[in-house]
Amino acid sequence: MAGRRAQTGSAPPRPAAPHPRPASRAFPQHCRPRDAERPPSPRSPLMPGCELPVGTCPDMCPAAERAQREREHRLHRLEVVPGCRQDPPRADPQRAVKEYSRPAAGKPRPPPSQLRPPSVLLATVRYLAGEVAESADIARAEVASFVADRLRAVLLDLALQGAGDAEAAVVLEAALATLLTVVARLGPDAARGPADPVLLQAQVQEGFGSLRRCYARGAGPHPRQPAFQGLFLLYNLGSVEALHEVLQLPAALRACPPLRKALAVDAAFREGNAARLFRLLQTLPYLPSCAVQCHVGHARREALARFARAFSTPKGQTLPLGFMVNLLALDGLREARDLCQAHGLPLDGEERVVFLRGRYVEEGLPPASTCKVLVESKLRGRTLEEVVMAEEEDEGTDRPGSPA
């Protein structure tokens, strides 16, 4: 008996395996940056007990790097002297921008002369938004790839020096806004170009993480915080995690118009209320429209699926395409026809769609949209530089008295 008790006691019951947590729809695994890949925050020291320096480089690209890349034929065509026919091409100090170089373990930190101070970093972001992002003679995918790389270098320079939270936030805000605009401008064929949409999405998420950690440290003021907290929610529309994080913000901050509208958009998206959702999307300024653009195709597909369930009959029921154009903020009848045909719905002439039972299908990703109505038209003559550097989203709105 005692032997049996000892044998039984030596084998305690094996604990049940923990259930895996489901991944949030707006945070796919490939877009969650691992801690080892995240750039350090602007105030985090790379080595304990070391005081971070302040950069002293006055140029967008240090002279030593310009000379090295010139010798090695590693200058981008956006960085060479216009019309230069030399071999190798000569770097233009007014156009060359420091490229991103991943910090290696054991490698000494760059000296202050190789780091750009926050004022130069902000001027660099302004240049990227105003001159490079607006380039009309270069494919948008190539522009996005160049801008994204140079913005990574901006954030790394910021992380390697002792910048204050207020000035760091201004640089992070401008960099993130620039990245959102160039990503939104990518066309349907961007996946075949030099810009990788998955990597760009991960970089946007990292940008939001760095900026929101800067806000969370409490040192301010941060006048654009309501707008950028709203951008975070719009970019992660439908994410339970993102909504939870926003709802943890102080009530005074959540009461600001940019965040109130972002919360309303998120609620309409969750409820599947297409009419309310697209009415709200049409009222958003340009930058929030860039942030939410990645969800427009899925929202339109969900709305079309609801139409198919409601209107489909064995003999077919028709609906004017003009109704869909207005309800879903499409760019015209042609886009409405393309949307219906991409989901297996036949057309009756040029202006009506037929909902036949069993014909609606979903294959692959929703068709890409130019989003002229929902995004491009909202520039209203403004340049990207003006949108990125100005407080467009906060104009005429109340700001929280104390976000702490």
From Swiss-Prot:
<dbReference type="GO" id="GO:0051301">
    <property type="term" value="P:cell division"/>
</dbReference>
<dbReference type="GO" id="GO:0005737">
    <property type="term" value="C:cytoplasm"/>
</dbReference>
<keyword id="KW-0206">Cytoskeleton</keyword>
<feature type="compositionally biased region" description="Pro residues">
    <location>
        <begin position="12"/>
        <end position="21"/>
    </location>
</feature>
<protein>
    <recommendedName>
        <fullName>SAC3 domain-containing protein 1</fullName>
    </recommendedName>
</protein>
<dbReference type="InterPro" id="IPR005062">
    <property type="entry name" value="SAC3/GANP/THP3_conserved"/>
</dbReference>
<dbReference type="GO" id="GO:0051298">
    <property type="term" value="P:centrosome duplication"/>
</dbReference>
<keyword id="KW-0132">Cell division</keyword>
<dbReference type="GO" id="GO:0005634">
    <property type="term" value="C:nucleus"/>
</dbReference>
<keyword id="KW-0498">Mitosis</keyword>
<dbReference type="GO" id="GO:0032991">
    <property type="term" value="C:protein-containing complex"/>
</dbReference>
<comment type="subunit">
    <text>May be part of a SEM1-containing complex.</text>
</comment>
<dbReference type="GO" id="GO:0005813">
    <property type="term" value="C:centrosome"/>
</dbReference>
<feature type="modified residue" description="Phosphoserine">
    <location>
        <position position="402"/>
    </location>
</feature>
<feature type="compositionally biased region" description="Basic and acidic residues">
    <location>
        <begin position="87"/>
        <end position="101"/>
    </location>
</feature>
<feature type="domain" description="PCI">
    <location>
        <begin position="203"/>
        <end position="379"/>
    </location>
</feature>
<feature type="region of interest" description="Disordered">
    <location>
        <begin position="77"/>
        <end position="117"/>
    </location>
</feature>
<dbReference type="InterPro" id="IPR000717">
    <property type="entry name" value="PCI_dom"/>
</dbReference>
<comment type="similarity">
    <text>Belongs to the SAC3 family.</text>
</comment>
<dbReference type="GO" id="GO:0005819">
    <property type="term" value="C:spindle"/>
</dbReference>
<comment type="function">
    <text>Involved in centrosome duplication and mitotic progression.</text>
</comment>
<feature type="region of interest" description="Disordered">
    <location>
        <begin position="1"/>
        <end position="58"/>
    </location>
</feature>
<dbReference type="Pfam" id="PF03399">
    <property type="entry name" value="SAC3_GANP"/>
</dbReference>
<keyword id="KW-0963">Cytoplasm</keyword>
<keyword id="KW-0131">Cell cycle</keyword>
<dbReference type="GO" id="GO:0051225">
    <property type="term" value="P:spindle assembly"/>
</dbReference>
<dbReference type="InterPro" id="IPR045107">
    <property type="entry name" value="SAC3/GANP/THP3"/>
</dbReference>
<keyword id="KW-0597">Phosphoprotein</keyword>
